[in-house]
Regions:
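Catalytic cores of glycan-processing enzymes that make or break glycosidic bonds
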Residues: 3-130
Length: 130
């Protein structure tokens, strides 16, 4: 695994980040956590991939598992970027779904995407593609 340094170039950082994503996708595909279609069309299968990454946690011996709210609703923007108190509107971005529609607190647990992720974390929806 590549250890990032603050002095690394942007290109080096981007290459390392892409290598990490590629390794994750390869592992998910080779172990049957995602379909071949998902591996070939990541943008069209984001929910399947995110749910698979969470389903893997169920195979660990960990007694405590969690899902970030942004992952559950499909938010694409970062809610917080540490070290950017003036450059980025940390914690002021309204929570939105994968389509950019604002998700209000009373809607969260009615969201089909959240309900699907909840089923994954309960072990009810951990489909493997083998």
């Amino acid at each position: 695994m590549y250890k990032r340094q603050l002095t690394d170039s942007v290109e080096t950082f981007q290459e390392a980040a892409q290598a990490e994503r590629d390794a994750m996708m390869k592992m998910l595909l080779e172990n049957g956590w995602i379909s071949k279609d998902a591996a070939e069309d990541v943008e069209g299968h984001v929910q399947e991939i995110v749910e698979a990454m969470h389903a893997i946690m169920l195979t660990s011996p960990s007694l405590l598992l969690q899902v970030a709210l942004v992952d559950a609703v499909g938010e694409k923007r970062s809610q917080n970027q540490p070290g950017t108190s003036t450059e980025y509107p940390n914690w002021r971005i309204p929570l939105a779904d994968a389509d950019g529609r604002v998700v209000h607190t009373d809607e969260v647990f009615k969201s089909p995407r959240v309900l699907s992720m909840t089923a994954v974390m309960r072990g009810e929806n951990t489909r493997k593609h083998v």
